[in-house]
Amino acid sequence: MKLLFLFFICLSFQITAQNVSEFSIGDRIIMDSEILDEERILNVYLPYGYSPDSTKTYPVIYLLDGSAHEDFIHVAGLVQFGSYSWINIVPESIVVGIENVSRNRDFTGETRNSLHKDAYPEMGGSANFIQYLDSEVFAYIDDNYNTTDERTIIGQSLGGLLATEILLKQPQMFNNYIIISPSLWFDYESYLDIEMKQTQEKLKIYVGVGDEGKIMKNAAKKLHKKLKKELKENDQLSWGYFKDNDHGDVLHFAVYDAFEHFFNQEK
């Protein structure tokens, strides 16, 4: 009995004596934004083998709703998995997740809907947020990491609304747009009336939606139809409908599908 007791004591000591260290998949950047006049956080996933001393460069995927408790972890996992040589649906990429402070403010433009104005008085800050992306976030990432000129944006719901606004007004900001379940009901679907600004760069655009109700599905279809008419001949437009997924889980499946549409043909 004493021997058994001593065995468990020794086993317990061995377990507690193991070294424990922090597990990290990238960097957490705290930056002061002059444009937004507030502190913002960026989460950065780096590909396996990334070295700041290497001459190898990587495309960058910018993820809205990019905190650890939102979409950063699972999207970074998709990028890691999809870039394995035996999967090869997306190139090795840096993922930049932009943590939210107020998505109602940052992802929406002005609205004529008085109910929304009263309920969410902070709405209407998308122009400042887009400037923050274009002037501060891009500059920081390009100055501190080994990046190429290729940029992808991923946005869902209100994030999809913002990605749509950028696509229509400043399409040169990104090469690839993954727009999932965009909240185009906002401001009486006025974004669908914006004439898309043209850019010389080739664009790849993916619009996806799940089984999320008539309003959301119809708005996504209208956006896809609008883009078919307004995109250049050499632009690429893809569509995804996920009947078995709803607003809560469609992003994960749609992003994987978008990667296959965008990059799988480049194998």
Regions found by a protein language model. Name each.
Residues 100, 178-186, 211-212:
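Active-site nucleophile loop of the alpha/beta-hydrolase fold
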